[in-house]
Amino acid sequence: MSSPGSPAYFLLLNALNWDKGDLMSAGEVLERLEVAYREDAVRARGREGVELYYESTGAGPVVLTLNNFFMTTPTWRVFTDELSVGHRVVSYDLCGHGRSSHPEKYPTWDEHVEDVVGLLDALEIDQAYLLSTSISTVLARDVALKHPDRVKGIVLAGPALGPRGMRRHRLVQRAWLLTLEQHGMAALYAHLYPEVFGAEMIEELGTPGFLGLRESFLALSTKEDLVNGLKLALTGETSADVLARIEAPTLVVIGDDDVLLSPSGAKELAEKFPNGRYEIMPGAGHLPFLDDAAGFQALVAKFIDEVETRA
């Protein structure tokens, strides 16, 4: 239970006690979605001259966000603004995406893992909580397996990991890649939209929301970046057995309208971790923070508070 006075305590009060009329709707949150970079941001140097664009906000236990291939650093701001009160939130662009270095050869999963550790080293951070979503949950898993001493806890939001394997996720990702390669970015967005967003949110946003988010989507990445990312997503370990080796406290968060992982699947997945638990967000889709940014941040803050209390 979160202790009175902790950041998680106040976030939970907000999430549980606000009247429906006081809550910011998903549409209002997405109206605040940012895609612009900070021109004065400093880049961190990592392996072989790789430079990573990053932003750091707040103070306290460190939360490192891990982008899926469809997100960039600016998009995290609206989904971590409350979390940055009482925590240090560090967001960065993956190598090969956004404002980070674009090497001639796209990074492997192992190189992405080393980039995470290199960024922590550059910022003199000993340990961090990894906040991952969709395909970046694979990166969080691999960092925790290869560098357990650097990981204090893991949040898997709408994970691309399954309790029995990743075959279903791979089929979906392969279909996304095929759409992108044959029909382009706008077609990929139309393909993704009903699979990523929950039904409630799609109804709330309507056609104006669909079109507005499409403009943001097209501004976030290039076709080349997404092709590279989706091709990488089709590689790497798929067995759920490796999860038993992850000792870090782990929180699985899904929406009950996530088409890629059911609530019962989330429970089974959490049970694969020695120190795992799960939360189901009503009405949310594959990326639950899109549907309820405040509620999601409250769950993450509560999880961190509980881990910090036990430490």
Language-model segments: residues:
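Flexible "cap/lid" loop of the alpha/beta hydrolase fold
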Residues: 141, 145-146, 152-182
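Conserved HGGG/HGGXW glycine-rich cap/lid loop of the alpha/beta-hydrolase fold
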Residues: 46-102
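Active-site loop/oxyanion-hole signature of alpha/beta-hydrolase fold enzymes
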Residues: 81, 90-132, 298
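Acidic catalytic loop of the alpha/beta-hydrolase fold
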Residues: 257-261
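Catalytic active-site module of serine/aspartate enzymes centered on a nucleophile-bearing elbow/loop
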Residues: 276-311
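Short beta-strand/loop motif that positions the catalytic acidic residue
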Residues: 246, 252-254
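Alpha/beta-hydrolase fold catalytic core
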Residues: 1-64, 85-87, 125, 301-311
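Conserved alpha/beta-hydrolase catalytic His-Asp/Glu region
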Residues: 166-167, 185-242
